[in-house]
Amino acid sequence: MTDIAMLPESWREVLGGELQQPYFKELMEFVEEERANGPVYPPREEVFAALDATPFDRVKVLVLGQDPYHGEGQGHGLCFSVRPGVKVPPSLRNIYKEMHAELDTPIPDNGYLMPWAEQGVLLLNAVLTVRAGEANSHKSRGWELFTDAVIRAVAARTDPAVFVLWGNYAQKKLPLIDEARHVVVKGAHPSPLSAKKFFGSRPFTQINEAVAGQGHEPIDWTIPNLG
């Protein structure tokens, strides 16, 4: 249950110790009990999909989300992203609108953000599982301790990164990041509740300027249409 093999290989050295912590064992027992009682998203094999898609040494940007999508077949373990064929959710629609206004990138027909992850954008939710139909149902069960360890691991690397903290929840993680070494892009959350402040904040330009300043290839934010 807490075998190190559950983690993608590139993350094992920096996160393996977390799996031995009492909180993590309790967390895994809780998630298994939840799965025994009904649907939990994402499926087991996609819980660590964000870490799988963006290896530790390739992280250029870390975008912090909150909670997985709680609808059937929506999420696949990357924050803000949905599977091909799933309707683009409101927050991601607003991200696309800002991207289009800022960079003139076409608004895609899908919400599958794997092209970002493959370029080094770690799309990390603070909580990695959720009960079907119940947002925040796995909050404060231990996932936050684990994902704080992910943030700290990236922040401890010699190679600097860009941390994207949208909204008050994400910005509570600021103490985990040394702003003298890394760049933090802060702003309003793209949710419809705060989108007015999000629009015009030009996060994608800020991120790419920082990425280039750190000596890395900027991110191509274009998401291809899947038809």
Swiss-Prot record:
The active site is at 67 (proton acceptor). Gene3D superfamilies: Uracil-DNA glycosylase-like domain (3.40.470.10). GO terms for biological process: base-excision repair, AP site formation via deaminated base removal. GO terms for cellular component: cytoplasm. Its EC number is 3.2.2.27. It is an enzyme of class 3 (hydrolase). It comes from the Bacteria. Coiled coil: none annotated. It holds the Pfam family UDG. PROSITE patterns: U_DNA_GLYCOSYLASE. It is found in: Cytoplasm. PANTHER family: URACIL-DNA GLYCOSYLASE. Belongs to the uracil-DNA glycosylase (UDG) superfamily. UNG family. This is Uracil-DNA glycosylase 2.
